Amino acid sequence: MNFMSFFKRPSTAPVAKDRLKLLLAHERVAIGNSDVVALLREEIVAVIAKHFPVESNAIKVRMETGEAISTLEVEVEIPTPLCVNVRLNANDDAKKKAEHQSRPIEAAAGG
């Protein structure tokens, strides 16, 4: 170490370069999250659809990125068994009503 270099100010270029690297890395992570969230959403929809009769638009996936932590929030609207049965019964009732209305009048009166 040279005696004259002891009193010399350190160059700010390496510090600025390190800060720029950190900033670029942070931005790349933030930009890449949209792809990650879309991929996660597709996989979550596929897994849930195996077990529950849900529509794709009933599943919402959000990622919030903070300074120290990122949070993945998944909101799923799963129909209760009662709702599924009511829908099935309503469809069956509609089919029966349609079949009854499509019968000829003579057959219904003759029986």
From Swiss-Prot:
Keywords: Cell cycle, Cell division. The keyword Transcription does not apply. Signal peptide: none annotated. SUPFAM superfamilies: Cell division protein MinE topological specificity domain. InterPro entries: MinE, MinE_sf. Gene3D superfamilies: Cell division topological specificity factor MinE. It comes from the Bacteria. Pfam families: MinE. One of its GO terms (biological process) is cell division. Prevents the cell division inhibition by proteins MinC and MinD at internal division sites while permitting inhibition at polar sites. This ensures cell division at the proper site by restricting the formation of a division septum at the midpoint of the long axis of the cell. Belongs to the MinE family. This is Cell division topological specificity factor. It comes from Methylocella silvestris (strain DSM 15510 / CIP 108128 / LMG 27833 / NCIMB 13906 / BL2).
